[in-house]
């Protein structure tokens, strides 16, 4: 174990010393902070390896301390001038090592091998002498390398000075170019500022115009709301009219249903009339049989026929009087036609009234004709019966029973006929009433339909005008959009030019700042290098210390460089952020300009819309005034027509009164005819009773008919008055 330790110790010492010298001389070239960190990381691993065997480490440490002490002493004596710092460090290190060796020697004084170790130390000192010679050779090599490094530093300084001169000349040229660019940019900036001022003035003018147009727009909006309210009222009136129409149509449907029911009843009554007529035909066949039996008695009653002819002449006279009265009615109709000609606007209502009057007249004439026919037939039958009774008075006595039965059946049939005639007349009156109500409802419906057509026509006109206005609005919008697009394009071009000029100015300013900072840093570095070179020339002997200082300076410079690089990166990031903020600001300005242009467009559109709405308002006012005039004229026409209708109703009542008078006169004439008949029949005593019975029946029939006519005229007059 001991023999193995001796030869290793001087070698390790020589290597340690040579490595320490080389590291002290070549640290700025070979080692870096990263290598130092790696070595520091490796040291604890080596310490762990050596701490495995404590006893062997103690012996080795003692031996190394001794050999180091012997090897360091001659080095300190020879190289005291060149390596003062190293000698001081080695002395400082040697003192604790000697103390440790002394302590170890004192601790191990009792060791019997100490004498052998001392001998071996002397032997090792000889070996160390040879190693010392090798160390001196290495020292000479290191001195040569130091001188070569100094020469290289001088060359680098010369190149550095030349680079500084070139850099300064380039900076001057760049400054001149930048000054020219700045002048140009200033001129462009002034031009852009002038453009901006003009644009601001235009914007202010547009803002004032916008405010004025907003006021006008608000006023027009108020007017539009008023017009909309008027339209809503018109729509409500339209809805009301439609509801009234629906009600009228419902009434018409109800009346039509009633008419259908009445027609069905009339048909039933006609069927019953046909059945009764068939029964009458049967009875008439029986009467014909009796007439064949009474033909012989006709010769006796020829005298009576002459008298009856005279009565007929009187009846014809009365009929002529009736015809004269009818001619007076025709004159009244002529007057009515003249009134209708004068009132052209109320033709429709007068035509309807004339139709009603003609229908009433035809109905009255038909009634009179039917009554006359019935009277003629009854008179003929009475004459036949009287002749038959005159000739066959004897047979009548025989056949009294049969005659009484026949008369009873005849009376029953007449009563049935009268009842059915009354029902038919009532139904006819109801039909007339329903027809009148239908005609009135139709006239109302026609008026309402005309009003609806007028309102629809007005609505269509308004819709057409609104569509025209919308087309004009769209055309104005397109033209305004084109103008706004052109203005936007010009503003965008100006904004782009402004942004480019601003960016160029900012870039030039930033480059100037960066160049100034770089120049300041370069000047500071030059000053530092000059001071360091002076120190190198003055302190050539203290090269090691200066190299250490330079190392520290290099480290600090590297730190400063890293710090400066970090600052540069930060400044770049801040510059990017500022550029982004500038871009955002420019975008916001562009958006503001766009919004201003959009507001200008909206104002122009609002102005155009307001003008169009004003035109619409004027048109609507004109149309409303025209409608009011038309409505007033229609009301006046309706009032005139109503007055005419009232006059015609009064004339109709007067005519009805005259007709009643004529009917009364007819009834009185019939009474006189009956009186004459009674006088004629008073000659024949046996037939008097039967003739009286028949005259009473005829009088009852005539009274009933007059009552029917009165009842028929009363509801008609009530309807006309209603």
UniProtKB/Swiss-Prot annotation:
Residues 134-722 are stromal. Residues 1-50, 51-84 form a transit peptide. Residues 85-112 are lumenal, thylakoid. A motif (Nuclear localization signal) lies at residues 705-712. One of its GO terms (cellular component) is nuclear matrix. One of its GO terms (biological process) is starch biosynthetic process. Predicted to be translocated into the thylakoid by the Tat system. One of its GO terms (molecular function) is DNA binding. Keywords: Chloroplast, Coiled coil, DNA-binding, Membrane, Nucleus, Plastid, Starch biosynthesis, Thylakoid, Transit peptide, Transmembrane, Transmembrane helix. The chain crosses the membrane at residues 113-133. Its main location: plastid. Residues 1-20, 687-722 are annotated as: Disordered. It is a single-pass membrane protein. It comes from the Eukaryota. It is found in: Plastid, Chloroplast; Plastid, Chloroplast thylakoid membrane; Plastid, Chloroplast stroma, Chloroplast nucleoid; Nucleus. Residues 146-679 form a coiled coil. Interacts with PTST2; the interaction is essential for the initiation of starch granules biosynthesis in leaf chloroplasts, for the correct location of the process in the stromal spaces between the thylakoid membranes, and for the association of PTST2 with the thylakoid membranes. Required for the initiation of starch granules biosynthesis in leaf chloroplasts. Anchored to the thylakoid membranes with its C-terminus facing into the stroma where it is essential for localizing PTST2 and SS4 to the stromal spaces between the thylakoid membranes in order to begin starch granule formation. Associated with leaf chloroplastic nucleoids in vivo. Binds to various chloroplastic double-stranded DNA fragments without particular sequence specificity in vitro. The C-terminal part is necessary for DNA-binding. This is MAR-binding filament-like protein 1-1. It comes from Nicotiana tabacum (Common tobacco).
């Amino acid at each position: 174990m001991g023999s193995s330790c001796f030869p290793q110790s001087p070698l390790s010492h020589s290597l340690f010393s040579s490595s320490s010298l080389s590291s002290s001389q070549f640290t700025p070239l070979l080692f870096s902070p990263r290598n130092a960190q790696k070595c520091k990381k490796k040291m604890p691993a080596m310490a762990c390896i050596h701490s495995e065997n404590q006893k062997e480490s103690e012996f080795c440490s003692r031996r190394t301390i001794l050999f180091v002490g012997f090897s360091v002493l001659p080095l300190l004596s020879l190289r005291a001038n060149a390596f003062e710092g190293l000698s001081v460090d080695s002395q400082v290190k040697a003192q604790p090592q000697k103390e440790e060796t002394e302590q170890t020697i004192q601790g191990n004084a009792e060791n019997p091998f100490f004498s052998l170790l001392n001998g071996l130390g002397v032997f090792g000192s000889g070996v160390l002498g040879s190693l010392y010679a090798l160390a001196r050779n290495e020292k000479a090599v290191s001195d040569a390398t130091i001188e070569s490094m100094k020469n290289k530093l001088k060359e680098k300084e010369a190149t550095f000075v030349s680079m500084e001169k070139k850099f300064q000349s380039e900076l001057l040229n760049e400054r001149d170019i930048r000054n020219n660019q700045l002048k140009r940019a200033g001129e462009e900036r002034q031009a852009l500022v002038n453009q901006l001022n003009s644009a601001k003035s235009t914007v202010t003018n547009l803002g004032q115009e916008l405010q004025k147009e907003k006021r006008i727009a608000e006023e027009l909006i108020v007017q539009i709301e008023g017009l909309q309210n008027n339209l809503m009222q018109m729509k409500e009136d339209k809805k009301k009219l439609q509801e009234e129409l629906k009600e009228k149509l419902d009434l018409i449907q109800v009346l039509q249903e009633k008419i259908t029911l009445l027609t069905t009843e009339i048909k039933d009554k006609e069927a019953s009339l046909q059945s009764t007529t068939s029964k009458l035909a049967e009875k008439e066949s029986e009467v014909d049989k009796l007439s064949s039996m009474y033909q012989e008695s006709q010769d006796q009653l020829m005298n009576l026929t002459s008298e009856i002819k005279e009565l007929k002449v009187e009846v014809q006279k009365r009929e002529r009087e009736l015809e004269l009265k009818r001619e007076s009615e025709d004159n009244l109709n002529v007057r009515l036609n003249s009134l209708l000609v004068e009132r052209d606007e109320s033709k429709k209502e007068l035509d309807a009234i004339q139709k009603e009057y003609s229908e009433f007249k035809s109905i009255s004439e038909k009634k009179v004709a039917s009554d006359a026919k019935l009277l003629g037939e009854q008179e003929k039958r009475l004459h036949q019966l009287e002749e038959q009774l005159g000739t066959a008075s004897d047979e009548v006595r025989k056949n009294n029973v049969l005659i009484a039965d026949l008369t009873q059946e005849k009376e029953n049939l007449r009563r049935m006929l009268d009842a059915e005639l009354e029902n038919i007349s009532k139904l006819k009156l109801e039909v007339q009433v329903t027809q009148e109500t239908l005609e009135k409802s139709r006239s109302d419906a026609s008026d309402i339909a005309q009003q609806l057509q007028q309102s629809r026509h007005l609505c269509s006109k308004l819709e057409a005008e609104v569509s025209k206005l919308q087309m004009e609005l769209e055309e104005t919008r397109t033209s305004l959009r084109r103008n706004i697009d052109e203005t936007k394009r010009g503003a965008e071009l100006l904004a782009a030019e402004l942004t480019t000029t601003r960016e160029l100015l900012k870039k030039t300013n930033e480059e100037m700042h960066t160049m100034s900072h770089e120049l300041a840093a370069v000047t500071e570095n030059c000053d530092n290098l000059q001071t360091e070179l002076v120190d190198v020339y003055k302190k050539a002997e203290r090269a090691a210390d200066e190299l250490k200082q330079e190392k520290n300076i290099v480290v600090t410079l590297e730190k400063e460089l890293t710090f400066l690089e970090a600052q540069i990166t930060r400044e770049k990031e801040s510059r990017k952020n500022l550029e982004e903020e500038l871009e955002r600001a420019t975008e916001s300005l562009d958006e503001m300009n766009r919004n201003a242009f959009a507001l200008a467009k909206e104002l122009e559109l609002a102005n155009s819309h307001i003008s169009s709405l004003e035109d619409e308002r004027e048109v609507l006012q004109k149309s409303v005034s025209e409608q009011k005039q038309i409505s007033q004229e229609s009301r006046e026409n309706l009032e005139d027509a109503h007055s005419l209708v009232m006059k015609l109703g009064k004339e109709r009542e007067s005519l009805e009164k005259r007709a009643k008078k004529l009917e009364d006169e007819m009834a009185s004439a019939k009474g006189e005819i009956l009186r004459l008949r009674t006088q004629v029949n008073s000659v024949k005593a046996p037939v008097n009773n039967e003739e009286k019975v028949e005259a009473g029946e005829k009088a009852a029939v005539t009274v009933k008919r007059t009552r029917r006519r009165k009842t028929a005229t009363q509801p008609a007059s009530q309807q006309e008055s209603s």
